[in-house]
Amino acid sequence: MARAKFERTKPHVNVGTIGHVDHGKTTLTAAITMTLAAQGKAQARKYDEIDAAPEEKARGITINTAHVEYETEKRHYAHVDCPGHADYVKNMITGAAQMDGAILVVAATDGAMPQTKEHILLARQVGVPSIVVFLNKVDMVDDEELLELVELELRELLNEYEFPGDEVPIIRGSGLKALEAMTANPKTLRGENEWVDKIYELMDAVDNYIPTPERDVDKPFLMAVEDVFSITGRGTVATGRIERGRIKLNETVELVGLRETRTTTVTGIEMFKKSLEEGIAGDNAGLLLRGLKKEDVERGMVIAKPGSITPHTKFEGEVYVLTEKEGGRKTPFFAGYRPQFYVRTTDVTGTITSFTSDDGSAAEMVMPGDRIKMTVELIQPIAIEQGMRFAIREGGRTIGAGVVSKIIE
């Protein structure tokens, strides 16, 4: 078992394929698994296995997502691929499958298409940090100038959405040709087939260009309060799941949201009725807070490293509005609509002041099934930050899912 243990030391990165329908995302995903399986670094997955993506629920929304995993010399990857366009929209907005980087698949025969643009825009809005491009189906294009033109257009498009279009690696290849080569001889290694080599070239780009994300435990401490108790003779305990960072005894923290920010000291950390010296990301813990009464703390506040997060009331969000079939509204809504925004552990009422379409023009109303950018004003300040996910609820049921794309005030 020594081998398995050794591999756990590789950094883990979450990636996904994005791009226009029928440009070859799933074929490429299958080709990557089969190519790396020849080195024993992946389980080979056929196209049909990936395409028949199981349904999952994220924030009450059903999404079809396929997950595959593989590794390179440098890293371990979890890779997500979605069968339908709506699944991508929902996946990226809910953050159901977090992406530290994306592989944008573009067919050389078509160039950039509407969903290519939409996926780049979404990646920008939801905070996908890096994109690597795979120019697919190049075996079907004889004209070198045409390929260069498509690349140029893609770089301009990436720049337009604030990705460094001039630096983004663009790898030319053919997912299908690589898949055919690997199917004919599953033991094909690097240097034995030109199309398989393109898959290795792509993985090199992913390895080297997509930065290793900072681990949750290394980020500034944050825990959203779920419940508050009073323990006679000891004080007030707030419970919740530590979202990121670590907390040690006697560290100073801030209580942020709903009221004036307050500073306090953590005098006890408990988990499963046992005292701990330290709590880390992922732990469900109870924190004993010095000098606070039970009524000073409420669900929806966050306990965080001082200065790391601030309360806000106005933000812009990229939102997917559920269809009636998904349990959402039957009717459209307009600016001035006042639903609840469920953030981390609590609902806060807010007014949607305006809607913006992808082209920057104002939209009058929003229909179930739409994706839209909206400006929201909450009635109480809460701890929010760019990239944070939220749900929109009406009478306790979810009618939309969103991500904060910009803080206004």
UniProtKB/Swiss-Prot annotation:
Catalytic activity as recorded in UniProt: GTP + H2O = GDP + phosphate + H(+)
Region entry G3, spans: 81-84
Keyword Transmembrane helix: no
Domain named tr-type G: residues: 10-214
Keyword Transmembrane: no
UniProt keyword terms in alphabetical order: Cytoplasm, Elongation factor, GTP-binding, Hydrolase, Magnesium, Metal-binding, Nucleotide-binding, Protein biosynthesis
Binding site for Mg(2+): 26
Gene3D superfamilies: P-loop containing nucleotide triphosphate hydrolases, Translation factors
One Gene Ontology term of the molecular function aspect: translation elongation factor activity
One GO cellular component term noted in the UniProt record for this chain: cytosol
Cell compartments where the protein resides: Cytoplasm
Disulphide bonds in the chain: none
CDD domains in the record: EF_Tu (cd01884), EFTU_II (cd03697), EFTU_III (cd03707)
EC number per UniProt: 3.6.5.3
Segments of this protein annotated with the region G5: 174-176
Known partners and oligomeric status: Monomer.
Function: GTP hydrolase that promotes the GTP-dependent binding of aminoacyl-tRNA to the A-site of ribosomes during protein biosynthesis.
NCBIfam families given in the database record: EF-Tu (TIGR00485), PRK00049.1 (NF000766), PRK12735.1 (NF009372), PRK12736.1 (NF009373), small_GTP (TIGR00231)
UniProt family annotation: Belongs to the TRAFAC class translation factor GTPase superfamily. Classic translation factor GTPase family. EF-Tu/EF-1A subfamily.
This protein's name: Elongation factor Tu
Gene that this sequence comes from: tuf
